[in-house]
């Protein structure tokens, strides 16, 4: 009856909360920093200062960074830079975490009530190099499709993107590049942090 359904619903909710708690405990410093930035920005509209205990790799190195946010297994925001725009990876994460949570044009800005349900990943991009169709592999490489000033990027290892043609087609569509236009292809590897 109704009580059983409610009981099942409560169990499912508890299971989800425990799952997210386990993910939070296992977060590496890159992801924890991205989450802390989003929570601070969404709750208080403040941009947090860099914490003193970040790994040296985040403070000394520069790279393009993508911050992806999911809710209930679905993308909720994803913004990034394919080349560094700041002095270090920590600042790059901070800027892109704020943008992913509040400025992704595909989604409304994230609100307080969603914060406990969000799961984050941070991609640190390697060197971007010219590529041929044959060199691409959607499991290993991200792709940038370029036509004059238009440019579309797709990260590697995305659910539902299994072939090079799918990867190129989606990246081209994101950039507003049409099938009959000449394109240049570029590839890059990422280190994905959870």
Residues covered by each model-derived region:
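Basic nucleic-acid-binding interfaces
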Residues: 3-194
């Amino acid at each position: 009856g109704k009580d059983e359904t409610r009981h099942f619903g409560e169990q499912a909710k508890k299971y989800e909360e425990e799952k997210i708690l386990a993910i939070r405990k296992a977060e590496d410093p890159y992801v924890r920093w991205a989450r802390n930035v989003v929570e601070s920005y969404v709750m208080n509209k403040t941009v947090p200062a860099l914490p003193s205990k970040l790994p040296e790799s985040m403070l000394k190195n520069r790279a393009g960074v993508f911050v992806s946010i999911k809710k209930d297994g679905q993308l909720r925001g994803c913004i990034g830079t394919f080349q560094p725009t700041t002095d270090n990876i920590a600042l790059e994460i901070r800027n892109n975490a704020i943008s992913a949570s509040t400025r992704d044009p595909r989604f409304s800005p994230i609100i307080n009530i969603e914060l406990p349900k969000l799961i984050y990943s941070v991609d640190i991009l390697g060197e971007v190099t010219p590529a041929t169709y044959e060199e691409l592999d959607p499991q290993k490489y991200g792709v940038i499709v370029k036509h004059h000033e238009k440019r579309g990027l797709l990260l590697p290892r995305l659910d539902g993107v299994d072939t090079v043609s799918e990867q190129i087609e989606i990246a081209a569509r994101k950039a507003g590049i049409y099938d009959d236009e000449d394109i240049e292809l570029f590839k890059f590897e990422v280190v994905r942090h959870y």
